[in-house]
Each structure stands twice: as C-alpha cells, then as structure tokens.
C-alpha cells in the first residue's frame, strides 16, 4: 500500500476539531472480524491510494458504529449513496455529501434522483458524483459492506489528503461549522523567527514558549488574584473562586473562560485529564449565574438580547454615525418610557437583571414573583427614575458643550418634543441660506466638542441620575467615571470589556446587592452572585444609558486626517455640515430625484435594487462623501433578508468573474496595479533590465491624480468596456463555491472563495482543483470544502447584472431617493476593479507606446510615469491636464508633481508642483529615488496623528498575548519586499528602511502599552516586554530573508551583508530612541536594552557598524518627531 501523505498541518487541524482522527484502515481494523483484510494483493492502485489518503474523523456527538457489522454488500454504490443522501435530507442535517440536494416540494420539483423517492438535485455536487461513480469506492463498499460504509458517510466525516499539504472533505458536517476543541487553542505555537531566544535579553522563566510568566502577571493584575507556586510542578493551591488566569502547563492560547460548550465523554475526559495535570477542573466563568433559592430557571442572569457579548460592555461602533432625531433622548428609551413609581422600578429591575423585556405601554403583563434580592432594590431604582425625569438634559448640554454665538439655528427637526430629555431651543445666529463655501465648512468643522467637554456632560448626567446608594461609595463612582473617560478616548474600533468595567469595584460597599440584611460571613458563592448583579448594573449603565446619551446628543465620526480618532459634533452643528455636504455632492455628481411612484416601483423591482446611504467624513478642507452599499430597496432587515443575500451573492460572483478575466487577459487593465505586490513586480521588472543595460539615462517622473474618479466615470463608456471584458454573447463560466479552512497562530481561519473557469480550463473533480491550486502556489496547509458548483453561468446574465447595478443605483440622502446618472458607487467591492478596467482601456488607446524604455503605473486613479524621454513625459502630462471627457478623466493639478521644468503656457496657465531632477519622488506612500530608482517608505502621513488612535487590538482575557500578536501581524505587513529587496535597493537603503520600520514599530509598541487594561505597569513584568522586542527583531530578520530568498545575508561571527546581529542592533536602537523619551514607564527595560545593544555593537565589524549608524541618522527620521504619541 502506498505511503500516506504527511500533511501535518491538516492532520493537526482535524485532531483539534474531532474526537478521533484515524486512517481508514485503522478504523476498519477495529470493526472487522479476525482475518478480514481491507487491502489485498493485486488491488488496483486507485483503491490503495484511497485507503492510504482517507482519514476518518469521528465528531464529538457521533453515534457509535454498529455493534456487529455484517461486512456484507447488499446494495450497489449508487443506491447506497442515494439512500444516505435521502436520510440526510429528511433529517435536515448539514452534510457535505448532501450539498446541492433537497427534498421535493410538491409536483413542481421534477422527478426525484435515481434510487430516491423524494430528493431532487438543484446544484451539481462534484464530490458526491465522483464518489458514487468511483471504482475504488465501489471496491471499498464490497470490502466493508453496507453497514460500515453507511455509518462512515452519514455519521462520520471523511477527508481525502491531497499531497503535498492539503485535503478536501468528502462527507460529514462542514468543517467550517465546527468549533475547535479547547485543546486546539492551547496547542503551542512555533516561535517567530526560528528558535533564537533573542539577543541576550533576559527570558521569562516559563515553559510556555518564552513569555508565559509575563502573560500570567498581566492576567493576575486583571483578575485581582495572586499567583503562588506551591511546588516545582507548578500546581495551583486550592482556591475559593474559579481562577481566570493562565493555568500552569497551558500555552498562552488557552482561553478557558471562553471555551465552547462541549459534549463530555469518558474517552475525552480521560484524555484531557491525562494531558493537563494540575489544571483547575471545569471551565471558569467570570460571573457564574444562577440565584440560590429561586425556583424558576427563567430568572437566571443572562445577557439580554441586543447587548454586546459577555466580553464587551460597550463598543464605539454602537454610537457612530447617529444622525437625525434632534438633541433629545428617544421616547422608546427605557428610562423615558417608565414612570417614577415602584411599578416602573420593578420593570427596570427586571429588564436590567432578569432579562425581561418591557412590553408596549398599556399591554397586560402577567405578574411574576420577584426574588427577594431584587424586590428590595425597587426604592433605589424608583429614585433613579425620578432623577431621570427631573434631569435638565438640555441645560446640561448647553453648559458643557456650548454652541458658538455664530452657530446656525436648528431647523424644525430639532424642535423640542414633549417628553423627558428634550433639549430646549437655543439662540444662535441664523446662517444665510445658500452659503456652502469651503470657508463655512471649515468654520463648522472646528466647532466639534472635545472629549473632555463630552466627558463633563456625561459625568454631570450620571451624578444627577444615579443615587448615592447605588454607587455604594465615592470610590465606585470614581472608578465608573474613569471608565467613561476611557470609552471616549477609544478609537473607531475600540471596545470596553466587562472585566475592565468591574475591575476594582468594591462589592461590599453596595448594601443593595445583599439578598438579606445583616452583617455576617459572606460565602464565596454569594459574593460571586453579588459581583454578577453589580456587573449587570454597570453593563446596563455604560452600554445602554451612556451610549444612549452619546447617540442622542452627538454625531460621532472619524476623520480622514486623524486615522481612527473619534470626533464629537453636536447634532445641530452636524445637521448644518450635512446640508452643506449634500449641496456640494449634488452639484458635483449627476443625480436624479425619484418620485414616490418611482420609489415604490424600485422597491417592487425584480431583481432587487441596491440602495446606498450617503454619509460624510470630515477632511482638512471639507467633507468626503462615503456611500455605504449593501441595502436593498424595500428590504426590512438588510443583513438577513433573502433578497439582500441573493443579490450580494450575485455581486460576488460578478466580482470573481471579472478577476478571472483580469488574470486571464492582464492587458485589459493597462498599467493598473492593485496593491503593493503588483507595484513590486512592475518596478522590479523595470529597474533590473534598465540597470543591466549600463548607466541609467536621466529619468523624468510625472505623478497625476484624477479628481473624483468614481463619480466622473461615464456609464455608457463603462458599459462598453465591461462588455469587451465579459464578451457576454460568447463566454459561459463555471463557478465553484469553496470554503478554505486552515490554522493560523493556533486558531482556525476560514475563507470562502469562488473559483471561476471556462469549459476550456475547468477542473471537473475537486481533487484536480486542489492539486492545481497547490501547483500555482495559492493553496497550502488547508482543507477545501466544496459548497456548490454552477456549470452554466452565462456571460450575458452577469453583464445584465452589471448594467442593473450601475444604471439603477439608488442613493438615499436624508428622506429622499436619487438615481445616480453618472459614475459608480464607491462602497461596492466592484468599484476599484471597474475603475481600473475603464482607465486601462483609456491607456491602451491614448498611450500605447508610453512604456517604451519606461514604466507607467496606476493605483486606481493615481498615475505615475517614469521615462527617459522628456517629450513623452510632457505629452503625457499635457494630455491628462487637458482632460479626457470620453472617460471622465479630469486632473487635480494641486496633486500633480513632476521633476522637470514645464514650459509656461504649455498647460494653459496651470503649473504643477516641480521638484528637483534628483529627489525622492512621492507616489502612493512611496518615495522613489529619481536617480537610483531605489524605494523608501513615505511616513509623512503619520505627521500630527496618534498611533494610539489608529492601532486597536482586541484585549480580551489575554491582553499581553493579543498585543504581541497584533504587533507582529502589523510588522509582517510593513516588511514588504518593495522596501527590503536587495536587488532593487542598495544595502544602505535597506538598512535605512529596516530601521524606519523598527522605529515605527516602537511607536506602535508604546501605543499598545498605553492601551493595556487594568493599569498594567511595564515594571511588573519586564521580561515579557523584552521578549516582545526580541520577537520583533527576529521576525523582522526572518521576513528580510524571505524577501531575499536565495541570497546569503549573514554568517557566523556577525559576518555577511546583513547579519542577524545587524537587524537586532537596528531594532534595539529604534526602541531605545522611542522608549527613552518615557523613562518613568520603561525604566525596567532601558538598562537591559542598552546592555544588549552595546554587546551587539562589539560583535559587529567596523564597516557594518558605520553603515548602521548612518542608517540611524536622526535627520532621516524627522517625520517621526511630529507623531503625537
């Protein structure tokens, strides 16, 4: 029998997801009688390969195999497979074998599939078709019989390995639906950058991959628990409370508190008990629910619907982009709908603590007995409701976030409505109608409220709302207000966890949490119950009340110039900004307003129409319109509506087909580059032959930016270009929907892709497709699951869908609907590709020979021409500056840059920015040396911005581990081959690029440290942070070697072009430059870093030291001095 492929990553992934993973022969050996051989002499090679490559995976909830299987074949293979498919469809089970099959729906379903009575096929399933027509599977049925093969197909999951590294699923629940076992997260991960322990920095004394002890210290502070070592084996002493920290013998990946529910079996319990000696038994929870003495399970503590998960108390995305509604609380808000009485207080208590949803006013309610703990809370919460009814929210808003005297008067939408929380009208001066110039916009943009003003408003509202008895002490009140301040300082993707909210809150100060009066010894279970009740109250206060205040009084948004930092505009200010922005947008883009009859017609249209909503993002000189695509006209719930899902699926199919044509005929895109990889390939292909020909001639650079590229594309011309791409009357496509599952950093990662082909290159069998993708280098260490396969996707149908999307695009602005008559929506996944196709067609027609001896690149709408011919450079510039109306191309002269003189009057009086002949030429975040053609990174975009606002990492239960992961993931993105390629760049340039990458990484490191929860000081676990710095250097050097594969960079004794010691020195020097500015924070790190740098300095040869010191010249990093962190 042939040897089974290793496929180690795939086998590890399957072992983490199933109870048992066995080779097919081993599984059958357990069931077969003595002397029964599965593989015999003379068997076909296909059958031997099937047995060697097939893995049997037993799910955790699988039924046991037949007790005494007969090993007798009764049915043919097609009949058995059909019978299994019918049973799966009748059970409604999700099984890869039954994908594409469903039960007949009356007489309209057509004839049933052969050997079935009520199953029809609505999509091809190539895996099932291959199985039931395979001679090898037929021989397997003959050897094992009906009982065993039926059990394998219906109760187990079968995978076929495809060498060298992949596999595909044959049957069983799809792998992407399974949740990996808790052991998968605890599986140790390989250290980055090889097995090096760092560069002489002290390592934590831990067995968890080098940084477990520090992580444990970070965890211990988060939990308020002390960690003790009871023996050399690291066992934990008995604890009263469930521990939530890192357990001895576990990797940093172990997230016990979030391990999924699992089916407990004796086999699994024994295996886990054997592998985790010394662990605290059972999963630990933060706030174990359940009220002792309450007889009904309906009163259990559980997260209420619509709230964030247990790990997130408040997320900034919940109060972003909330326009309209006036500066008042919604009438439907819970506090506004309840009277300040004991009955209202009871409803409030039930909603906050017992997951009860208040019904509509006046609706009869069935009274339920309230537990004693919650019954005695009613007077306090009645007082809270009374405080809310008496709170002058309008006066508080005016006092803490005042409007300037010149602010415009609010329109009718902002008049105070009857009810609690309204904001009375103020008396700002009215703005003249029709004033929409940029000066007015800039004036309004400066009138945002600072986070400190917003915090003052929230603090005043909370102090008026919450009675002192609910806080219990001033300490608890100050802790909560500190978290409110932190919520306002988070970025666009920030979140505040439940653990941060309850940290350092004193439960014993809150007398209202007690189930009965009296001071006596509090059992551990009772204390945990009080923690849970207090946590629910704080969760509601922050996640409902504070968030509602922000949603009601402010429009919160990010900007284009401050990354993810949030800005707070009062609703009255933003309404004026939005009106000016809409007026400018209507002047710039051709929109036709729809009548009410046309709106109803579009809502009932088939196929469904995409509807976009327009919002604006502030930029330095005005507002940038952003179109959010994804809604369907008339759909009640966009994410779940079937019309939305169907249309979204069709759009993704069109996107996959356009990408297929782009890859098959790259000339259609002209000079388009779709990312850094494309830029690297094109620039390398231009630079290396040019240098090989001898001394490079003077080169002329032209950078041109197009104004409003997406909004200016003529729809008729775009339709002509896409018709040439799709050739709808000729092409028919085959689209295969596949899921790819792999492991990355110890976690299961899944992606869903569409593989497009035509009949000329179609791979009929999934095995062939997996082999093809591996040969192309686009698939590795993954399991492929085929979801569906469409063999007849007409090009005409896809072209009609494209016309439908472009010419029937509805935009909602305010309460009105418009049809876009020119351009395409920017928020669609198709936008970039459509723009690239259109401009590619323009380049092929207008500039067919411009790339001779030069290169033309275009990233969407940013052109770059490099040519040794001055005449061609001037002709190219002149053509684009005059504009190309046929393609809607109009140049923004303020962003046009050249490095040669432009004759006066040659461009009609306009003059672009002229740089010296030899300079660092800027283009799309790059700095190109106009003489040597070397590439540097352009970091000017970081000027006067906060790294902390732009870098967000999910802190969770393991903030240190997540910080390290985030930093290394960002480092991998920034270490691109374009900057590290030693064939394109000189060694000195690579030294400089590496140093700047490490210096920016040091800024990110500091930003992450500032974001660590629970006020974690660096001095508490310096070994962990030193290891993060060591990992940064080793990962950076590993990426450098990967970007220069085949080159010899270093040797023993710090010899070679770029030894690892040089990368370590650059990393240490960059971190010391940044961390030394914060001596108090990093006092425990600076000494070790300086010692390690000095040791490396002695090891490096003199020429290398001189080159490194030149790369670290402070003059080269002047841009970093303006970063705000």
From Swiss-Prot:
Domain Reverse transcriptase: start-end pairs: 598-928
Alphabetic keyword roster: Chromosome, Cytoplasm, DNA-binding, Magnesium, Metal-binding, Nucleotidyltransferase, Nucleus, Phosphoprotein, Ribonucleoprotein, RNA-directed DNA polymerase, Telomere, Transferase, Ubl conjugation
Site (Required for nucleotide incorporation and primer extension rate): 860
CP motif as annotated region, ranges: 385-405
Motif (Bipartite nuclear localization signal): 226-244
GO biological process: telomere maintenance via telomerase
Region feature Primer grip sequence, mapped onto this chain: 923-927
Binding residues for Mg(2+): 705, 861-862
Residues covered by region (QFP motif): 364-514
Region of interest: RNA-interacting domain 1: 1-234
Residue ranges of the region described as Required for regulating specificity for telomeric DNA and for processivity for primer elongation: 137-141
Domain of life: Eukaryota
Motif (TFLY): 316-321
Catalyzed reactions per annotation: DNA(n) + a 2'-deoxyribonucleoside 5'-triphosphate = DNA(n+1) + diphosphate
Cystines in this chain: none
UniProt xrefs under CDD domains: TERT
Family in the record: Belongs to the reverse transcriptase family. Telomerase subfamily.
Name of the molecule in the record: Telomerase reverse transcriptase
Organism, as annotated: Bos taurus
Organismal lineage: Eukaryota, Metazoa, Chordata, Craniata, Vertebrata
The gene coding this protein: TERT
């Amino acid at each position: 029998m042939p040897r089974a492929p290793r496929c180690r990553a795939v086998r590890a992934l399957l072992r983490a997801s199933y109870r048992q993973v066995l080779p097919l022969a081993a599984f059958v050996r357990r069931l077969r009688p003595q002397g029964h051989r599965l593989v015999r002499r003379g068997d076909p090679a296909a059958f031997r390969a099937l047995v060697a490559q097939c893995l049997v995976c037993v799910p955790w909830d699988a039924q046991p195999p037949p007790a005494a299987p007969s090993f007798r074949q009764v049915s043919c293979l097609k009949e058995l497979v059909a019978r299994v498919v019918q049973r799966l469809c009748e059970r409604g089970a999700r099984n890869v074998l039954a994908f594409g099959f469903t039960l007949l729906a009356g007489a309209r379903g057509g004839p049933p599939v052969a050997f079935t009575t009520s199953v029809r096929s609505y999509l091809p399933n190539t895996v099932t078709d291959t199985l039931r027509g395979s001679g090898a599977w037929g021989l397997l049925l003959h050897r094992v019989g009906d009982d065993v093969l039926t059990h394998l197909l219906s109760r187990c999951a079968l995978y076929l390995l495809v060498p060298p590294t992949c596999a595909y699923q044959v049957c069983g629940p799809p792998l992407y639906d399974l949740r990996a076992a808790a052991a998968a997260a605890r599986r140790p991960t390989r250290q980055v950058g090889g097995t090096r322990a760092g560069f002489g920095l002290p390592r934590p004394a831990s067995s968890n991959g080098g940084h477990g002890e520090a992580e444990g210290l970070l965890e211990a502070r988060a939990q308020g628990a002390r960690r003790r070592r009871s023996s050399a084996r690291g066992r934990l002493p008995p604890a009263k409370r469930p521990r939530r920290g890192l357990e001895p013998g576990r990797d940093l990946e172990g997230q016990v508190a979030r391990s999924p529910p699992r089916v407990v079996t004796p086999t699994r319990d024994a295996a886990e008990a054997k592998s985790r000696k010394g662990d605290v038994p059972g999963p630990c929870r933060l706030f174990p629910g359940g009220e002792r003495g309450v007889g009904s399970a309906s009163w259990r503590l559980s997260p209420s619907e619509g709230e964030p998960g247990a790990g997130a108390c408040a997320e900034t995305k919940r109060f972003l982009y909330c326009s309209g509604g006036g500066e008042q609380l919604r009438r439907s808000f819970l506090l506004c709908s309840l009277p300040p009485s004991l009955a209202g207080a009871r409803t409030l208590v039930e909603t906050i603590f017992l997951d009860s949803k208040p019904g509509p006013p006046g609706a009869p309610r069935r009274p339920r007995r309230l537990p004693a703990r919650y019954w005695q809370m009613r007077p306090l919460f009645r007082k809270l409701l009374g405080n809310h009814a008496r709170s002058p929210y309008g006066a508080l808003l005016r006092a803490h976030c005042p409007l300037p005297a010149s602010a415009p008067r609010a329109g009718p939408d902002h008049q105070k409505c009857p009810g609690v929380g309204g904001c009375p009208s103020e008396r700002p001066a009215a703005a003249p109608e029709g004033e929409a110039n940029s000066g007015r916009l800039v004036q309004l943009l400066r009138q945002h409220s600072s986070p400190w003003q917003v915090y003052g408003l929230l603090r005043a509202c909370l102090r008026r709302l919450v009675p002192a008895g609910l806080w219990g002490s001033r300490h608890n009140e100050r802790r909560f207000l500190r978290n409110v301040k932190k919520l306002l300082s988070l970025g666009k993707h920030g979140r505040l966890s439940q653990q941060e909210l309850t940290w350092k809150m004193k439960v014993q100060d809150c007398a209202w949490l007690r189930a009965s009066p009296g001071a006596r010894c509090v059992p551990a279970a009772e204390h945990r119950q009080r923690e849970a009740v207090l946590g629910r109250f704080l969760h509601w206060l922050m996640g409902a009340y504070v968030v509602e205040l922000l949603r009601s009084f402010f429009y919160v948004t990010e900007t284009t110039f401050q990354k993810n930092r949030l800005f707070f505009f009062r609703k009255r200010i933003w309404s004026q900004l939005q009106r000016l922005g809409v007026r400018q947008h209507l002047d710039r883009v051709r929109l036709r307003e729809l009548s009410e009859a046309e709106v109803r017609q579009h809502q009932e249209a088939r196929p469904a129409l995409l509807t976009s909503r327009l919002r604006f993002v502030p930029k330095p000189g005005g507002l940038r319109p952003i179109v959010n695509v994804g809604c369907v006209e008339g759909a009640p719930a966009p994410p779940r509506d079937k019309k939305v899902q169907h249309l979204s699926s069709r759009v993704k199919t069109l996107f996959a087909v356009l990408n297929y044509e782009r890859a098959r005929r790259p000339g259609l895109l002209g000079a388009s580059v779709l990312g850094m990889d494309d830029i690297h390939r094109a620039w390398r292909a231009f630079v290396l032959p040019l240098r090989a020909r001898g001394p490079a001639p003077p080169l002329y650079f032209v950078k041109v930016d197009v104004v409003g590229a997406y909004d200016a594309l003529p729809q008729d011309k775009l339709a002509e270009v896409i018709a040439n791409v799709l050739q709808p009357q000729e092409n028919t496509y085959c689209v295969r929907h596949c899921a790819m599952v792999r492991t990355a950093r110890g976690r299961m990662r899944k992606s869903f892709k569409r593989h497009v082909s035509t009949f000329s290159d179609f791979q009929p069998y999934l095995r062939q497709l997996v082999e093809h993708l591996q040969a192309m280098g686009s698939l590795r260490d993954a399991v492929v699951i085929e979801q569906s396969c469409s063999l007849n996707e007409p090009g005409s149908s896809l072209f009609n869908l494209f016309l439908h999307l472009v010419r029937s695009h509805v935009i909602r602005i305010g309460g009105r609907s418009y049809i876009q008559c020119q351009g395409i929506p920017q928020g669609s996944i198709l936008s970039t590709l459509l723009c690239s196709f259109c401009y590619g067609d323009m380049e092929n027609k207008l500039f067919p020979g411009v790339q001779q001896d030069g290169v033309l690149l275009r990233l969407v709408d940013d052109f770059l021409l490099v040519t040794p011919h001055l005449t061609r450079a001037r002709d190219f510039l002149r053509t684009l500056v005059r504009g190309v109306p046929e393609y809607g191309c109009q140049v923004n002269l303020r962003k046009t840059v050249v490095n040669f003189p432009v004759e006066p009057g040659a461009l009609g009086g306009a003059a672009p920015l002229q740089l010296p002949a030899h300079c660092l030429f800027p283009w799309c975040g790059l700095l190109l040396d106009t003489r040597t053609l070397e590439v540097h990174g352009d970091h000017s975009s970081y000027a006067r911005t906060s790294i902390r606002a732009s870098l967000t990492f999910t802190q969770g239960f393991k903030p240190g581990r997540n910080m390290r992961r985030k930093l290394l993931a960002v480092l991998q993105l920034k270490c691109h081959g374009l900057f590290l390629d030693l064939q394109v760049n000189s060694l000195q340039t690579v030294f400089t690029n590496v140093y700047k990458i490490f210096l920016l990484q040091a800024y990110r490191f500091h930003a992450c440290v500032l974001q660590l929860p629970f006020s974690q000081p660096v001095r508490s676990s310096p070994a962990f942070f030193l290891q993060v710095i060591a990992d940064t250097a080793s990962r950076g050097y590993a990426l450098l070697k990967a970007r220069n594969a085949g080159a010899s960079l270093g040797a023993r004794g710090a010899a070679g072009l770029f030894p690892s010691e040089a990368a370590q020195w650059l990393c240490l020097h960059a971190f010391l430059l940044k961390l030394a500015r914060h001596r108090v924070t990093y006092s425990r790190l600076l000494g070790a870093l300086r010692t390690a740098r000095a040791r490396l300095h002695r090891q490096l040869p003199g020429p290398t030291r001189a080159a490194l010191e030149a790369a670290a010249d402070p003059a080269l990093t002047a841009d970093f001095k303006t970063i705000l962190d």
